[in-house]
Amino acid sequence: MRGLDRWIAEAIRSESLDHNGQIICGGLFLEESLPSSSVSFLSSKDCSVNSCRFSQKSSFLKFRRRNGTREPLFLSVSLSINESNGEEEEGEGYNGQNGFKSEKGSVLIGGGQESKEKRRVKENGAGALNTTKHLWAGAFAAMVSRTCIAPLERMKLEYIVRGEQGNLLELIQRIATNEGIRGFWKGNLVNILRTAPFKSINFYAYDTYRGQLLKLSGNEETTNFERFVAGAAAGVTASLLCLPLDTIRTVMVAPGGEALGGVVGAFRHMIQTEGFFSLYKGLVPSLVSMAPSGAVFYGVYDILKSAYLHTPEGKKRLEHMKQEGEELNAFDQLELGPMRTLLYGAIAGACSEAATYPFEVVRRRLQMQSHAKRLSAVATCVKIIEQGGVPALYAGLIPSLLQVLPSAAISYFVYEFMKVVLKVESSA
């Protein structure tokens, strides 16, 4: 068995270390039968002879042969390092040849690559879990917000699909008389089935795109342009994946939709009568509307949030959150606080809805067209203006805003709250 001094000397020569400036911080007693290829040599590139010294305390771990085997006996030695001031500290590990840091008191023996692989698998698993929690936070936000504002959503659709021009109170009375209270939640299940995955993907895509843009730019904070680009990309991504459910919901709410037999019946009817691509009616105006809608919605919210967090009050709140940490309840862990989160969410939603509402009207009309009488998006827009003038493009804007204000406020609040509860790690 080789002595430690001989092993260190050979290791120094093999590592081409500077004797005047570097020192070996670990070693192994090895039997001759154990090949050197199975050992990852540990050295400290940051510890010099002048500034560090070995502690008198060293930890030893002895590995014995298994019964009935002839595996070599070897002994690992872990040496800790002290600063030049003489205070003893335990070593936190040293950089091995495999490129990552070993744990304190450990020596890498033929398992460097395996440990690296285990760490990679662990990181991938943690990333997948974080993504799942992120998606659930967005989905739960959509379910809560849509259920709360389902009656307003129903009235908005009545204005768009039927071209209602009457008094809002008269519309409420008619729905209550003909369909009862449950009529205000008509189509809410399919609405949740549509909006839950939509908002889930939308929120997650925005945070992901924003984080990637931040990494590419190398800035400390996301710029307003990056926020708008990330929001637009998130809107397009969610629209491409979720438009079919939105089309089915619109058909169910339209006159005669009750006879189709629910979501499955409406889906089967559209496939049989108009083909699969009928589920993507209004795709172009949907993409055209969702790109600016997502840009405005997420951009405005993030701009307001960033502006507040740079104020003295915002900085003080962040500092307080950092000091208290997990001792704060979930509401107090919201960076903006409950009320400001609701307010900024409502403002962002109102700005987004007002900016893109005409595209929404055109898209709904396209979804209602039969295959034989289908018009292009431009032709549909022209027809709407011819029949009711430019104000027709904003038909139902008031009930829509009444629906969007609480919806956006609740949605953003629940989303931020669930991220705290589920301990979602930020992408940016």
UniProtKB/Swiss-Prot annotation:
Gene Ontology CC annotations of this record: mitochondrial inner membrane; plastid
Entry keywords, A to Z: Membrane, Mitochondrion, Mitochondrion inner membrane, Repeat, Transmembrane, Transmembrane helix, Transport
Solcar repeats by residue range: 129-212, 222-307, 336-421
SUPFAM superfamilies on file: Mitochondrial carrier
Superkingdom of the source species: Eukaryota
Keyword Transmembrane: yes
Coiled-coil ranges from the UniProt annotation: none
Transmembrane annotation, as ranges: 132-152, 187-207, 228-248, 283-303, 342-362, 390-410
Subcellular location: Mitochondrion inner membrane
Protein family: Belongs to the mitochondrial carrier (TC 2.A.29) family.
Membrane disposition: Multi-pass membrane protein
GO process terms (BP): transmembrane transport
InterPro entries per UniProt: Mit_carrier (IPR002067), Mitochondrial_sb/sol_carrier (IPR018108), Mt_carrier_dom_sf (IPR023395)
Protein name: Probable mitochondrial adenine nucleotide transporter BTL3
Functional note: Probable mitochondrial adenylate carrier that catalyzes the transport of ATP, ADP and AMP.
UniProt key word Membrane: yes
